[in-house]
Regions:
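Acidic/His-rich structured neighborhood in mature extracellular/periplasmic domains
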Residues: 109-268
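Bacterial N-terminal signal peptides that target proteins for export
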Residues: 5, 15-29
Length: 358
């Protein structure tokens, strides 16, 4: 039986095959020809000027009203929530809690348990969420910056209203008819112990307060630039998601790349170190043009690792590689605007004109 080649061996093989020297990305290099490869996805081309119209995102503290419900007057307070938040309360009950708005009795019973439960950690979680999100000045500023930059690119898109809520570990972000929501109890830190009961370890990386703005913007982009069901090949999915990541990075100019994609710094460094090997493995297996759902899910969906590449890799490597290709495409075609990029649906053309050769 032919031994399974490790990613590291594949990496070395691909470099040897191309007659080049293997160099780790975190080494200091003096070879000018490699500079373009080493600068990563931080495309510094100025697509959005500094002097743009500022927009103010309205943040509604529904979470505070939720947690002000009193155990001895739950029904009365729930009725008041419907009156005070008639726009959002039905969305919250049906979309987040998956209950009928007409079933007030069950909602009150569930809410009583939600306020006092200590087994699942709801009471402790609610208290911590209130404390961590007591001051949202930084969140407000970051949202204003992100949506101001997006408004410059797409002024026809309506700025959403953002509600903060506690979800009972049901939802991180949501979007419905230009109303967005953030489940603040899902952003209490990747080391928050009660998350061990509700999510896998690999999912906890983005359950941090710093990820709220990126998650909101990412969902907003996905809603306004919907996925085309005709994208049935891996290449098309990679380029589509890569374009979304490129746009998201322009809205978060002060965020490092690993935060934009939701990796740890160590995961990002691993990808950069083995980028050539990753690409060689994809090409060697001819995965770019595969349509099998197992292959697509392995590359594009979140998971502990990308099974098609290596158990040492982070998940969603297809997204990461797609972003690298799109970034290379924009670097090598500086006259292309972001609008033109987002309206270019020929994934093969983007790949060819990216000159992506890690």
């Amino acid at each position: 039986m032919r031994p399974r080649r490790s990613l590291e061996n594949s990496f070395a093989y691909s470099l040897k095959f191309n007659g080049k020297i293997m160099i780790k990305r975190n080494n200091i290099l003096c070879i000018a020809m490699l500079a373009g490869i080493l600068c990563g996805c931080g495309n510094k081309h100025q697509y959005i000027p500094k002097d743009i119209e500022a927009v103010e995102v309205e943040i509604v503290r529904f979470d505070n009203a939720q947690l002000a419900v009193r155990p001895d007057s739950v029904k009365q307070d729930i009725v008041q929530l419907y009156a005070d938040y008639e726009e959002f309360m039905p969305i919250f009950v049906e979309g987040i809690l998956h209950l009928s708005v007409e079933d007030t009795a069950y909602l009150c019973e569930m809410y009583s348990n939600f306020l006092s439960d200590t087994i699942m950690g709801f009471a402790q979680t609610n208290a911590l969420a209130q404390s961590m999100f007591s001051n949202i000045d930084e969140l407000q500023e970051s949202l204003n910056i992100g949506f101001s930059r997006l408004h410059y690119l797409y002024p026809e898109w309506e700025i959403p209203k953002v509600y903060l809520f506690v979800s009972g570990f049901n939802s991180s972000v949501m979007y419905y008819e230009n109303i967005m929501g953030v489940g603040v109890d899902m952003y209490l830190g990747s080391d928050y112990p009660y998350y061990n009961q509700v999510v896998y370890n690999y999912q906890k990386q983005t359950m941090r307060k710093e990820c709220v703005v990126g998650d909101l913007l990412s969902m907003y982009i996905a809603y306004n630039i919907p996925y085309n069901s005709k994208y049935n090949r891996l290449l098309e999915q990679m380029i589509f998601r890569g374009k979304q990541m490129f746009l998201l990075a322009q809205l978060l100019p002060d965020e490092p790349e690993w935060e934009v994609i939701g990796y740890s710094k160590e995961q990002w460094d691993w990808c950069e170190m083995y980028e050539r090997g990753i690409w060689h493995r994809i090409m060697e297996k001819r995965d770019l043009f595969k349509t099998e759902s197992m292959v697509l899910n392995s590359y594009m969906n979140n998971g502990p690792f990308t099974a098609e590449i290596s158990q040492d890799s982070p998940g969603r490597l297809g997204l990461w590689v797609g972003w690298r290709i799109v970034d290379s495409y924009m670097r090598n075609n500086k006259d292309i605007t972001i609008h033109e990029l987002m309206n270019e649906f020929d994934a093969q053309k983007i790949l060819e004109q990216s000159f992506y050769k890690p």
